[in-house]
């Protein structure tokens, strides 16, 4: 009588056999159809190795189970997505920081003079941070497209149009809240020494310092937007705006001069918005001005020390540029000394 224990190859399984005889996880992988492995064996009479496919008791070659094939494809897709997002974050940083660094050389020649080694260090730390930012972003980008994990939507009519700008404000406020409190935590002595000192090693910071973080600090910054997109609906275009604004503000807050008009940092509006004039004072005094976009938490918690100015740094840059024979040499030195005395 023919044996009834032999099953057909995996490619010929019926849907019931794929699910398992018992219809549950325990019966999902039949024991006589193990994962196909290729084991090296010596070819008779030659001593050379050849590959031998594992077969079941009936001589049928064994194929990978559907679970293994799906898991392999999933891991490959997630890895590629994470690598792609790392590349995007890194290139975005290089383009934006590079553009503002070039603008600095035109607007304030000599401001970054003597900081070449520091800027190389800032770029190295920032590119390492780009990988840390890219991994969770890549995983969620894959999960959004493949499984709808996030609350990101691409149909602008899926929600009322007024919700689009509202979601931007909500995201910015929550991001600012997260940044303020994690930033204050970073200034606790032990944490500062272990991690945040990397960022404050830039004295003064340059346009390249926006993402110059220790990995511990980079992780605290990398998780906030992924957490928000899991919880709060946002249109893909609005999310792009938030990410773009985050990058621009991170760079301009560190580049050593004020790019925004005075009403944004010196008038009533400036009492609530953070630009380079506000954040520069944090890098000078450390124990104040912790916010990212808004001065709300600094003012509420008594850590707001107002805005600073760049007169002394700009005067020093003007003297350095004049001494190097730059185009401002014909009077830049005297102007620089006057500005320095005024500061």
Regions found by a protein language model. Give the residues of each.
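Alpha-helical transmembrane segments in multi-pass membrane proteins
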Residues: 75-133
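Juxtamembrane helix-loop-helix connectors linking adjacent transmembrane helices
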Residues: 135-174
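Cytosolic/stromal cytosol-facing helical appendages immediately following the last transmembrane segment
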Residues: 71-75, 79-84, 106-116, 197, ...
């Amino acid at each position: 009588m023919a044996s009834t224990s032999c099953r057909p190859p995996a490619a010929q399984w019926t849907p019931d056999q794929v699910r398992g005889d018992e219809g549950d996880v325990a019966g999902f992988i039949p024991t006589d159809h193990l994962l196909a492995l290729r084991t090296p064996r010596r070819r008779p009479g030659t001593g050379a190795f050849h590959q031998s496919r594992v077969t079941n008791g009936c001589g049928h070659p064994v194929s990978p189970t559907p679970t293994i094939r799906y898991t392999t494809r999933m891991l490959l897709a997630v890895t590629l997505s994470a690598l792609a997002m790392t590349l995007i974050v890194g290139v975005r940083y290089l383009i934006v920081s590079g553009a503002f660094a070039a603008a600095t050389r035109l607007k304030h020649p000599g401001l970054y003079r003597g900081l070449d080694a520091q800027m190389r260090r800032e770029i190295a730390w920032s590119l390492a941070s780009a990988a840390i930012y890219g991994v969770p972003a890549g995983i969620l980008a894959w999960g959004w497209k493949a499984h709808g994990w996030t609350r990101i939507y691409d149909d602008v009519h899926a929600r009322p149009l007024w919700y689009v700008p509202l979601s931007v404000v909500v995201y910015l406020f929550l991001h600012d809240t997260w940044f303020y409190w994690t930033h204050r935590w970073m200034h606790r002595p032990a944490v500062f020494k272990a991690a945040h000192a990397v960022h404050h090693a830039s004295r003064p910071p340059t346009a390249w310092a926006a993402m110059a973080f220790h990995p511990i600090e980079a992780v605290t910054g990398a998780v906030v937007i992924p957490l928000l997109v899991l919880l709060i609906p946002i249109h893909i275009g609005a999310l792009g705006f938030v990410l773009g604004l985050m990058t621009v503000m991170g760079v301009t807050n560190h580049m050593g001069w004020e790019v925004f008009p005075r009403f944004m940092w010196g008038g009533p509006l400036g009492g609530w918005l953070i630009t380079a004039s506000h954040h520069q004072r944090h890098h000078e005094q450390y124990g104040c001005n912790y916010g990212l976009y808004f001065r709300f938490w600094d003012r509420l918690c008594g850590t707001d020390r107002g805005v600073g100015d760049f007169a002394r740094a700009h005067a020093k840059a003007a003297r350095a540029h004049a001494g190097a024979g730059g185009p401002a040499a014909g009077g830049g030195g005297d102007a620089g000394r006057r500005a320095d005395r005024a500061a």
